[in-house]
Protein backbone atom coordinates (compact mmCIF):
# COMPACT_ATOMS: atom_id res chain seq x y z
CA UNK A 1 0.00 0.00 0.00
CA UNK A 2 1.34 3.43 -0.94
CA UNK A 3 2.22 5.75 1.88
CA UNK A 4 0.12 8.84 2.43
CA UNK A 5 1.43 12.03 0.80
CA UNK A 6 3.52 14.19 3.11
CA UNK A 7 1.48 16.85 4.81
CA UNK A 8 2.59 19.38 7.36
CA UNK A 9 -0.49 20.31 9.35
CA UNK A 10 0.19 23.53 11.25
CA UNK A 11 -0.97 24.11 14.78
CA UNK A 12 -4.56 25.40 15.09
CA UNK A 13 -4.87 29.19 15.06
CA UNK A 14 -5.94 29.27 18.72
CA UNK A 15 -6.77 27.04 21.67
CA UNK A 16 -10.10 25.58 20.60
CA UNK A 17 -13.48 25.05 22.08
CA UNK A 18 -13.84 21.31 21.53
CA UNK A 19 -17.19 19.98 20.35
CA UNK A 20 -17.38 16.39 21.60
CA UNK A 21 -19.35 14.43 19.00
CA UNK A 22 -21.67 11.76 20.43
CA UNK A 23 -22.91 10.83 16.96
CA UNK A 24 -24.90 13.98 16.35
CA UNK A 25 -26.29 14.99 12.99
CA UNK A 26 -25.42 18.56 13.91
CA UNK A 27 -21.90 18.29 15.40
CA UNK A 28 -20.36 20.29 12.56
CA UNK A 29 -23.17 22.81 12.79
CA UNK A 30 -22.46 23.28 16.51
CA UNK A 31 -18.81 23.97 15.70
CA UNK A 32 -19.89 26.50 13.12
CA UNK A 33 -22.24 28.25 15.54
CA UNK A 34 -19.41 28.52 18.08
CA UNK A 35 -17.33 30.21 15.40
CA UNK A 36 -20.21 32.55 14.60
CA UNK A 37 -19.82 33.69 18.20
CA UNK A 38 -16.23 34.52 17.15
CA UNK A 39 -14.65 31.68 19.10
CA UNK A 40 -12.48 29.03 17.41
CA UNK A 41 -13.82 25.46 17.63
CA UNK A 42 -13.08 21.95 16.43
CA UNK A 43 -14.90 18.62 16.57
CA UNK A 44 -13.50 15.54 18.32
CA UNK A 45 -15.10 12.09 18.72
CA UNK A 46 -16.55 11.02 22.05
CA UNK A 47 -13.92 8.27 22.13
CA UNK A 48 -11.16 10.83 22.76
CA UNK A 49 -9.46 10.11 26.08
CA UNK A 50 -9.02 12.58 28.90
CA UNK A 51 -5.32 12.71 28.07
CA UNK A 52 -6.08 13.53 24.43
CA UNK A 53 -8.54 16.23 25.44
CA UNK A 54 -6.10 17.72 27.92
CA UNK A 55 -3.36 17.77 25.28
CA UNK A 56 -5.54 20.01 23.09
CA UNK A 57 -5.70 22.60 25.89
CA UNK A 58 -9.38 23.39 25.25
CA UNK A 59 -10.84 26.68 26.36
CA UNK A 60 -14.22 24.98 26.83
CA UNK A 61 -16.11 21.82 25.89
CA UNK A 62 -19.47 21.51 24.16
CA UNK A 63 -21.11 18.08 24.37
CA UNK A 64 -23.20 17.34 21.27
CA UNK A 65 -26.45 15.48 20.87
CA UNK A 66 -26.63 11.87 19.76
CA UNK A 67 -29.08 9.07 18.92
CA UNK A 68 -28.46 6.82 21.96
CA UNK A 69 -29.96 6.52 25.44
CA UNK A 70 -27.38 7.25 28.13
CA UNK A 71 -28.46 4.33 30.32
CA UNK A 72 -28.41 1.65 27.60
CA UNK A 73 -25.49 -0.82 27.44
CA UNK A 74 -22.88 0.32 24.94
CA UNK A 75 -24.14 3.90 24.79
CA UNK A 76 -21.43 6.57 24.53
CA UNK A 77 -20.41 7.63 28.00
CA UNK A 78 -18.93 10.81 29.38
CA UNK A 79 -15.91 10.35 31.63
CA UNK A 80 -16.61 12.29 34.86
CA UNK A 81 -12.91 13.21 34.85
CA UNK A 82 -13.83 15.78 32.19
CA UNK A 83 -15.17 17.95 34.99
CA UNK A 84 -11.84 17.78 36.83
CA UNK A 85 -10.10 19.61 33.97
CA UNK A 86 -11.42 22.92 35.23
CA UNK A 87 -12.75 24.02 31.83
CA UNK A 88 -16.30 25.26 31.15
CA UNK A 89 -18.68 22.60 29.79
CA UNK A 90 -21.97 23.02 27.91
CA UNK A 91 -24.21 20.02 27.17
CA UNK A 92 -26.73 19.80 24.32
CA UNK A 93 -29.51 17.15 24.14
CA UNK A 94 -27.70 13.80 24.62
CA UNK A 95 -24.67 15.72 25.87
CA UNK A 96 -26.94 17.41 28.42
CA UNK A 97 -28.18 14.03 29.62
CA UNK A 98 -24.69 12.50 29.69
CA UNK A 99 -23.53 15.51 31.69
CA UNK A 100 -26.38 15.12 34.19
CA UNK A 101 -25.72 11.41 34.61
CA UNK A 102 -21.96 11.85 35.06
CA UNK A 103 -22.50 14.49 37.75
CA UNK A 104 -25.02 12.48 39.76
CA UNK A 105 -28.31 13.60 38.24
CA UNK A 106 -31.07 11.32 36.99
CA UNK A 107 -31.99 10.48 33.39
CA UNK A 108 -35.05 8.36 32.60
CA UNK A 109 -37.37 7.30 29.82
CA UNK A 110 -40.43 9.24 30.95
CA UNK A 111 -42.77 8.06 28.21
CA UNK A 112 -43.14 11.61 26.93
CA UNK A 113 -41.10 12.41 23.84
CA UNK A 114 -40.59 15.80 22.23
CA UNK A 115 -39.70 16.08 18.55
CA UNK A 116 -39.79 19.35 16.68
CA UNK A 117 -41.02 22.72 17.87
CA UNK A 118 -41.63 22.91 21.62
CA UNK A 119 -42.36 25.74 24.04
CA UNK A 120 -39.63 26.37 26.60
CA UNK A 121 -40.54 28.03 29.89
CA UNK A 122 -37.69 30.02 31.44
CA UNK A 123 -37.57 29.64 35.23
CA UNK A 124 -34.66 31.95 36.01
CA UNK A 125 -30.88 31.82 35.98
CA UNK A 126 -28.37 33.54 33.72
CA UNK A 127 -28.37 31.37 30.59
CA UNK A 128 -31.70 32.75 29.31
CA UNK A 129 -31.59 36.09 31.11
CA UNK A 130 -33.14 38.89 29.05
CA UNK A 131 -34.79 36.44 26.64
CA UNK A 132 -38.56 35.78 26.40
CA UNK A 133 -40.01 33.89 29.36
CA UNK A 134 -41.69 31.49 26.95
CA UNK A 135 -39.89 30.79 23.70
CA UNK A 136 -39.93 28.21 20.89
CA UNK A 137 -37.09 25.69 20.77
CA UNK A 138 -36.31 22.61 18.70
CA UNK A 139 -36.40 19.34 20.64
CA UNK A 140 -35.46 15.79 19.65
CA UNK A 141 -35.51 13.48 22.66
CA UNK A 142 -37.23 10.43 24.09
CA UNK A 143 -35.38 10.44 27.42
CA UNK A 144 -35.23 13.34 29.85
CA UNK A 145 -33.31 14.60 32.85
CA UNK A 146 -35.68 14.14 35.79
CA UNK A 147 -33.36 15.44 38.52
CA UNK A 148 -30.49 17.89 38.14
CA UNK A 149 -27.14 17.16 39.81
CA UNK A 150 -26.46 18.69 43.22
CA UNK A 151 -25.45 22.33 43.02
CA UNK A 152 -27.25 22.96 39.73
CA UNK A 153 -30.13 25.36 39.28
CA UNK A 154 -32.95 24.23 36.98
CA UNK A 155 -33.45 27.25 34.73
CA UNK A 156 -35.99 26.03 32.15
CA UNK A 157 -38.65 23.39 31.59
CA UNK A 158 -40.84 22.14 28.76
CA UNK A 159 -44.02 20.02 28.58
CA UNK A 160 -41.93 16.87 28.21
CA UNK A 161 -38.87 17.80 30.29
CA UNK A 162 -39.17 19.08 33.83
CA UNK A 163 -35.44 19.80 33.62
CA UNK A 164 -34.94 21.37 30.17
CA UNK A 165 -31.89 23.42 31.17
CA UNK A 166 -29.63 23.77 34.17
CA UNK A 167 -26.56 25.75 35.18
CA UNK A 168 -23.88 26.04 37.83
CA UNK A 169 -22.24 29.43 37.45
CA UNK A 170 -19.58 28.79 40.09
CA UNK A 171 -18.26 25.76 38.17
CA UNK A 172 -18.98 27.31 34.73
CA UNK A 173 -21.18 24.36 33.75
CA UNK A 174 -24.50 24.50 31.91
CA UNK A 175 -26.66 22.50 29.55
CA UNK A 176 -29.92 22.44 27.61
CA UNK A 177 -32.19 19.65 26.41
CA UNK A 178 -33.05 21.46 23.18
CA UNK A 179 -30.91 22.22 20.12
CA UNK A 180 -29.66 25.83 20.25
CA UNK A 181 -27.60 25.33 17.09
CA UNK A 182 -30.51 24.94 14.65
CA UNK A 183 -32.35 27.84 13.08
CA UNK A 184 -35.66 26.52 14.46
CA UNK A 185 -34.50 27.71 17.92
CA UNK A 186 -34.67 31.50 17.36
CA UNK A 187 -32.74 32.46 20.52
CA UNK A 188 -30.34 29.52 20.40
CA UNK A 189 -27.35 31.49 19.17
CA UNK A 190 -27.82 33.99 21.99
CA UNK A 191 -27.85 31.18 24.55
CA UNK A 192 -24.73 29.59 23.08
CA UNK A 193 -22.98 32.96 22.92
CA UNK A 194 -23.92 33.68 26.53
CA UNK A 195 -22.30 30.43 27.64
CA UNK A 196 -19.14 31.12 25.63
CA UNK A 197 -18.69 34.75 26.56
CA UNK A 198 -20.32 35.05 30.01
CA UNK A 199 -20.00 31.59 31.57
CA UNK A 200 -16.70 30.62 29.95
CA UNK A 201 -15.33 34.16 29.77
CA UNK A 202 -14.03 33.77 26.22
CA UNK A 203 -13.26 36.77 24.05
CA UNK A 204 -14.65 37.28 20.54
CA UNK A 205 -11.29 36.93 18.82
CA UNK A 206 -12.10 34.60 15.90
CA UNK A 207 -12.51 37.35 13.27
CA UNK A 208 -11.62 37.50 9.60
CA UNK A 209 -8.75 39.90 10.27
CA UNK A 210 -7.31 37.73 13.02
CA UNK A 211 -7.80 34.53 11.02
CA UNK A 212 -6.05 35.98 7.97
CA UNK A 213 -3.16 37.29 10.04
CA UNK A 214 -2.61 34.02 11.88
CA UNK A 215 -2.86 31.90 8.72
CA UNK A 216 -0.39 34.09 6.84
CA UNK A 217 2.10 33.68 9.68
CA UNK A 218 1.53 29.92 9.76
CA UNK A 219 2.15 29.62 6.02
CA UNK A 220 5.26 31.77 6.33
CA UNK A 221 6.56 29.50 9.10
CA UNK A 222 5.72 26.30 7.21
CA UNK A 223 7.26 27.26 3.87
CA UNK A 224 10.17 29.29 5.22
CA UNK A 225 12.47 30.27 2.35
CA UNK A 226 11.00 27.62 0.05
CA UNK A 227 8.98 27.94 -3.12
CA UNK A 228 5.39 26.84 -3.60
CA UNK A 229 3.07 26.01 -6.43
CA UNK A 230 -0.70 26.43 -6.15
CA UNK A 231 -3.42 24.88 -8.23
CA UNK A 232 -6.24 27.20 -9.22
CA UNK A 233 -9.56 25.57 -10.04
CA UNK A 234 -11.47 28.79 -10.65
CA UNK A 235 -13.31 28.43 -7.36
CA UNK A 236 -13.31 30.43 -4.15
CA UNK A 237 -11.22 28.03 -2.09
CA UNK A 238 -8.14 27.80 -4.29
CA UNK A 239 -8.23 31.54 -4.97
CA UNK A 240 -8.27 32.43 -1.26
CA UNK A 241 -5.62 29.83 -0.47
CA UNK A 242 -3.40 31.29 -3.19
CA UNK A 243 -3.97 34.85 -1.98
CA UNK A 244 -3.02 33.84 1.57
CA UNK A 245 0.17 32.13 0.46
CA UNK A 246 1.11 35.00 -1.83
CA UNK A 247 0.66 37.40 1.09
CA UNK A 248 3.03 35.15 3.07
CA UNK A 249 5.80 34.42 0.55
CA UNK A 250 5.29 36.85 -2.35
CA UNK A 251 6.70 35.93 -5.74
CA UNK A 252 7.99 32.60 -4.45
CA UNK A 253 4.48 31.34 -5.24
CA UNK A 254 3.60 30.24 -8.76
CA UNK A 255 -0.06 29.57 -9.50
CA UNK A 256 -0.92 26.88 -12.01
CA UNK A 257 -4.32 26.62 -13.63
CA UNK A 258 -4.83 23.13 -15.02
CA UNK A 259 -7.41 23.10 -17.78
CA UNK A 260 -8.45 19.47 -17.44
CA UNK A 261 -11.19 19.79 -20.01
CA UNK A 262 -13.82 19.41 -17.29
CA UNK A 263 -14.56 23.13 -16.89
CA UNK A 264 -17.80 25.00 -17.45
CA UNK A 265 -18.26 27.28 -20.44
CA UNK A 266 -16.00 30.36 -20.30
CA UNK A 267 -14.34 29.33 -17.05
CA UNK A 268 -10.74 29.26 -18.26
CA UNK A 269 -10.88 32.83 -19.57
CA UNK A 270 -12.59 34.04 -16.41
CA UNK A 271 -9.93 32.55 -14.13
CA UNK A 272 -7.09 33.97 -16.19
CA UNK A 273 -8.71 37.40 -16.20
CA UNK A 274 -10.16 37.80 -12.70
CA UNK A 275 -7.53 36.19 -10.50
CA UNK A 276 -4.52 37.82 -12.11
CA UNK A 277 -6.23 41.20 -12.07
CA UNK A 278 -7.04 40.83 -8.37
CA UNK A 279 -3.70 39.52 -7.11
CA UNK A 280 -1.04 40.13 -9.72
CA UNK A 281 0.15 36.57 -9.10
CA UNK A 282 2.34 34.56 -11.43
CA UNK A 283 -0.08 32.33 -13.35
CA UNK A 284 0.76 29.45 -15.67
CA UNK A 285 -1.98 27.64 -17.61
CA UNK A 286 -1.55 23.96 -18.46
CA UNK A 287 -3.70 22.50 -21.23
CA UNK A 288 -4.24 18.90 -20.16
CA UNK A 289 -7.73 18.15 -21.49
CA UNK A 290 -6.67 15.29 -23.76
CA UNK A 291 -4.63 13.63 -21.00
CA UNK A 292 -7.52 13.70 -18.55
CA UNK A 293 -10.04 12.37 -21.06
CA UNK A 294 -7.74 9.51 -22.01
CA UNK A 295 -7.26 8.59 -18.35
CA UNK A 296 -11.02 8.69 -17.71
CA UNK A 297 -11.95 6.62 -20.77
CA UNK A 298 -14.15 3.69 -19.82
CA UNK A 299 -14.35 4.66 -16.13
CA UNK A 300 -17.85 4.91 -14.66
CA UNK A 301 -17.27 4.44 -10.92
CA UNK A 302 -17.46 7.80 -9.09
CA UNK A 303 -14.61 7.00 -6.69
CA UNK A 304 -12.50 5.82 -9.59
CA UNK A 305 -13.12 9.06 -11.47
CA UNK A 306 -12.25 11.21 -8.45
CA UNK A 307 -9.02 9.36 -7.80
CA UNK A 308 -7.99 9.47 -11.47
CA UNK A 309 -8.66 13.20 -11.61
CA UNK A 310 -6.66 13.71 -8.41
CA UNK A 311 -3.74 11.68 -9.77
CA UNK A 312 -3.73 13.41 -13.16
CA UNK A 313 -4.00 16.77 -11.42
CA UNK A 314 -0.78 16.12 -9.51
CA UNK A 315 0.98 14.81 -12.61
CA UNK A 316 0.06 18.02 -14.42
CA UNK A 317 1.64 19.97 -11.60
CA UNK A 318 4.81 17.95 -11.77
CA UNK A 319 4.93 18.65 -15.49
CA UNK A 320 4.50 22.37 -14.84
CA UNK A 321 7.38 22.29 -12.39
CA UNK A 322 9.64 20.64 -14.96
CA UNK A 323 8.58 22.69 -17.97
CA UNK A 324 7.99 26.12 -16.46
CA UNK A 325 10.04 26.41 -13.31
CA UNK A 326 13.13 24.60 -14.54
CA UNK A 327 15.76 24.00 -11.88
CA UNK A 328 14.09 26.23 -9.28
CA UNK A 329 13.28 23.91 -6.35
CA UNK A 330 9.58 23.74 -5.57
CA UNK A 331 8.79 21.73 -2.46
CA UNK A 332 5.26 22.78 -1.51
CA UNK A 333 1.86 22.34 -3.12
CA UNK A 334 -0.91 24.69 -1.95
CA UNK A 335 -4.49 23.41 -2.00
CA UNK A 336 -7.81 24.90 -0.93
CA UNK A 337 -8.94 22.02 1.27
CA UNK A 338 -11.74 23.03 3.69
CA UNK A 339 -12.93 21.56 6.98
CA UNK A 340 -15.98 19.83 5.40
CA UNK A 341 -13.62 18.24 2.82
CA UNK A 342 -11.52 16.78 5.62
CA UNK A 343 -14.56 15.54 7.53
CA UNK A 344 -16.25 13.93 4.49
CA UNK A 345 -12.99 12.24 3.48
CA UNK A 346 -12.65 10.63 6.89
CA UNK A 347 -9.93 13.03 7.96
CA UNK A 348 -11.48 13.65 11.35
CA UNK A 349 -11.03 10.97 13.99
CA UNK A 350 -14.05 8.73 14.25
CA UNK A 351 -15.64 9.91 11.02
CA UNK A 352 -16.79 7.73 8.14
CA UNK A 353 -15.42 8.27 4.65
CA UNK A 354 -18.42 9.58 2.70
CA UNK A 355 -16.48 10.17 -0.51
CA UNK A 356 -12.95 11.00 -1.59
CA UNK A 357 -12.30 14.65 -2.31
CA UNK A 358 -9.79 15.12 -5.12
CA UNK A 359 -7.71 17.37 -2.88
CA UNK A 360 -7.83 15.06 0.16
CA UNK A 361 -8.51 11.35 -0.28
CA UNK A 362 -7.92 11.34 -4.03
CA UNK A 363 -4.23 12.22 -3.84
CA UNK A 364 -1.67 9.63 -4.96
CA UNK A 365 0.59 8.06 -2.36
CA UNK A 366 3.79 9.02 -4.19
CA UNK A 367 3.08 12.74 -4.07
CA UNK A 368 6.34 14.63 -4.59
CA UNK A 369 5.24 17.81 -2.83
CA UNK A 370 4.53 18.63 0.78
CA UNK A 371 0.96 19.86 1.05
CA UNK A 372 0.14 23.31 2.35
CA UNK A 373 -3.55 23.55 3.24
CA UNK A 374 -4.08 26.91 4.97
CA UNK A 375 -7.89 26.64 4.87
CA UNK A 376 -8.31 23.08 6.18
CA UNK A 377 -9.86 24.27 9.46
CA UNK A 378 -12.28 26.77 7.86
CA UNK A 379 -15.88 26.58 6.72
CA UNK A 380 -16.90 28.15 3.40
CA UNK A 381 -18.35 31.33 4.90
CA UNK A 382 -15.10 31.87 6.81
CA UNK A 383 -13.12 31.41 3.60
CA UNK A 384 -15.20 34.10 1.90
CA UNK A 385 -14.65 36.46 4.85
CA UNK A 386 -10.89 35.87 4.73
CA UNK A 387 -10.92 36.46 0.97
CA UNK A 388 -12.60 39.83 1.45
CA UNK A 389 -10.09 40.67 4.18
CA UNK A 390 -7.30 39.94 1.68
CA UNK A 391 -8.86 42.28 -0.87
CA UNK A 392 -10.22 39.76 -3.36
CA UNK A 393 -13.16 41.10 -5.42
CA UNK A 394 -16.73 39.88 -5.03
CA UNK A 395 -16.52 38.25 -8.47
CA UNK A 396 -14.18 35.73 -6.85
CA UNK A 397 -15.29 35.42 -3.22
CA UNK A 398 -19.03 35.31 -3.96
CA UNK A 399 -18.81 32.60 -6.62
CA UNK A 400 -20.91 29.51 -6.12
CA UNK A 401 -18.87 26.43 -5.16
CA UNK A 402 -17.63 24.27 -8.02
CA UNK A 403 -15.86 20.95 -7.37
CA UNK A 404 -12.22 20.53 -8.34
CA UNK A 405 -13.02 17.44 -10.46
CA UNK A 406 -15.39 19.72 -12.38
CA UNK A 407 -17.95 18.32 -14.78
CA UNK A 408 -16.26 14.93 -14.51
CA UNK A 409 -18.37 14.16 -11.44
CA UNK A 410 -21.50 15.74 -12.89
CA UNK A 411 -21.72 13.14 -15.63
CA UNK A 412 -23.16 9.93 -14.25
CA UNK A 413 -21.32 7.37 -16.33
CA UNK A 414 -18.30 7.56 -18.61
CA UNK A 415 -16.86 11.02 -19.30
CA UNK A 416 -16.56 11.72 -23.03
CA UNK A 417 -15.96 14.85 -25.07
CA UNK A 418 -19.50 14.68 -26.49
CA UNK A 419 -21.10 14.35 -23.06
CA UNK A 420 -18.98 17.20 -21.72
CA UNK A 421 -20.15 19.45 -24.55
CA UNK A 422 -23.78 18.52 -23.85
CA UNK A 423 -23.43 19.20 -20.13
CA UNK A 424 -21.60 22.51 -20.71
CA UNK A 425 -24.46 23.81 -22.82
CA UNK A 426 -27.09 22.76 -20.29
CA UNK A 427 -25.10 24.16 -17.37
CA UNK A 428 -24.58 27.47 -19.14
CA UNK A 429 -28.32 27.83 -19.79
CA UNK A 430 -29.21 27.04 -16.17
CA UNK A 431 -26.68 29.55 -14.84
CA UNK A 432 -27.84 32.25 -17.25
CA UNK A 433 -31.49 31.87 -16.24
CA UNK A 434 -30.81 31.69 -12.49
CA UNK A 435 -28.69 34.85 -12.70
CA UNK A 436 -31.29 36.65 -14.82
CA UNK A 437 -33.93 35.77 -12.20
CA UNK A 438 -31.79 37.28 -9.43
CA UNK A 439 -31.40 33.98 -7.59
CA UNK A 440 -27.61 33.80 -7.30
CA UNK A 441 -27.58 35.04 -3.70
CA UNK A 442 -30.33 32.60 -2.69
CA UNK A 443 -28.72 29.47 -4.12
CA UNK A 444 -25.60 27.98 -2.50
CA UNK A 445 -24.88 26.12 -5.72
CA UNK A 446 -26.74 24.45 -8.53
CA UNK A 447 -25.06 21.35 -9.93
CA UNK A 448 -26.38 20.45 -13.36
CA UNK A 449 -26.03 16.70 -13.87
CA UNK A 450 -26.09 14.64 -17.07
CA UNK A 451 -27.33 11.07 -16.69
CA UNK A 452 -25.01 9.66 -19.30
CA UNK A 453 -26.06 6.04 -18.88
CA UNK A 454 -29.80 6.78 -18.89
CA UNK A 455 -32.08 7.56 -21.82
CA UNK A 456 -35.76 8.33 -21.92
CA UNK A 457 -38.33 8.44 -24.69
CA UNK A 458 -39.57 11.84 -25.81
CA UNK A 459 -41.37 13.60 -28.66
CA UNK A 460 -39.81 16.57 -30.44
CA UNK A 461 -41.06 17.92 -33.76
CA UNK A 462 -43.54 15.04 -34.11
CA UNK A 463 -40.63 12.62 -33.96
CA UNK A 464 -39.78 10.06 -31.32
CA UNK A 465 -36.58 10.86 -29.44
CA UNK A 466 -34.43 8.81 -27.11
CA UNK A 467 -32.31 11.31 -25.22
CA UNK A 468 -30.53 11.84 -21.94
CA UNK A 469 -32.11 13.48 -18.88
CA UNK A 470 -30.56 16.54 -17.24
CA UNK A 471 -30.92 16.92 -13.48
CA UNK A 472 -31.07 20.34 -11.80
CA UNK A 473 -29.81 20.29 -8.20
CA UNK A 474 -30.24 23.81 -6.70
CA UNK A 475 -29.45 23.77 -2.98
CA UNK A 476 -29.37 26.20 -0.09
CA UNK A 477 -26.71 25.73 2.57
CA UNK A 478 -24.45 27.57 4.98
CA UNK A 479 -21.40 25.33 5.07
CA UNK A 480 -22.03 22.32 2.77
CA UNK A 481 -22.35 19.99 5.78
CA UNK A 482 -26.15 20.10 5.48
CA UNK A 483 -28.29 21.42 2.63
CA UNK A 484 -31.89 21.81 1.52
CA UNK A 485 -33.22 22.08 -2.01
CA UNK A 486 -33.89 25.63 -3.15
CA UNK A 487 -37.48 26.54 -3.97
CA UNK A 488 -36.80 27.98 -7.42
CA UNK A 489 -39.94 29.62 -8.87
CA UNK A 490 -41.79 27.38 -11.32
CA UNK A 491 -41.58 29.94 -14.12
CA UNK A 492 -37.77 29.97 -13.85
CA UNK A 493 -37.63 26.17 -13.91
CA UNK A 494 -39.93 26.21 -16.93
CA UNK A 495 -37.63 28.58 -18.83
CA UNK A 496 -34.58 26.47 -18.00
CA UNK A 497 -36.30 23.26 -19.09
CA UNK A 498 -37.64 24.76 -22.31
CA UNK A 499 -34.29 26.21 -23.32
CA UNK A 500 -32.29 23.09 -22.51
CA UNK A 501 -34.61 20.73 -24.39
CA UNK A 502 -34.77 23.13 -27.35
CA UNK A 503 -31.13 24.19 -27.52
CA UNK A 504 -29.14 21.16 -26.36
CA UNK A 505 -29.07 18.13 -28.68
CA UNK A 506 -29.46 14.70 -27.09
CA UNK A 507 -31.45 16.06 -24.12
CA UNK A 508 -35.22 15.57 -24.04
CA UNK A 509 -36.01 15.71 -20.34
CA UNK A 510 -35.13 18.01 -17.40
CA UNK A 511 -35.82 16.89 -13.82
CA UNK A 512 -35.47 18.58 -10.42
CA UNK A 513 -33.66 16.94 -7.49
CA UNK A 514 -35.46 17.86 -4.24
CA UNK A 515 -33.38 15.71 -1.87
CA UNK A 516 -31.91 17.33 1.23
CA UNK A 517 -28.45 16.60 2.66
CA UNK A 518 -28.58 14.24 4.47
CA UNK A 519 -29.53 11.78 3.08
CA UNK A 520 -28.16 12.85 -0.30
CA UNK A 521 -24.87 14.65 -0.89
CA UNK A 522 -24.88 17.90 -2.88
CA UNK A 523 -23.00 16.40 -5.81
CA UNK A 524 -24.33 13.23 -7.38
CA UNK A 525 -20.86 11.68 -7.49
Curated annotation (Swiss-Prot):
Keyword Nucleotide-binding attributed: yes
Query: Active-site positions, per UniProt?
Result: 93, 179, 181
Q: Which SUPFAM superfamilies match?
A: Adenine nucleotide alpha hydrolases-like, Class I glutamine amidotransferase-like, GMP synthetase C-terminal dimerisation domain
Q: Which reaction does it catalyse?
A: XMP + L-glutamine + ATP + H2O = GMP + L-glutamate + AMP + diphosphate + 2 H(+)
Query: Could you tell me the gene encoding this protein?
Result: guaA
EC main class here is ligase
**Record's keyword terms, sorted:** ATP-binding, Glutamine amidotransferase, GMP biosynthesis, Ligase, Nucleotide-binding, Purine biosynthesis
- Start and end residues of each GMPS ATP-PPase domain: 206-399
Pathway(s) the chain acts in: Purine metabolism; GMP biosynthesis; GMP from XMP (L-Gln route): step 1/1
Identify this protein by name: GMP synthase [glutamine-hydrolyzing]
Subunit composition and interactions? Homodimer.
Write down the species: Mycolicibacterium paratuberculosis (strain ATCC BAA-968 / K-10)
Quote the cellular component terms of the Gene Ontology held in the record: cytosol
Q: What is its EC number?
A: 6.3.5.2
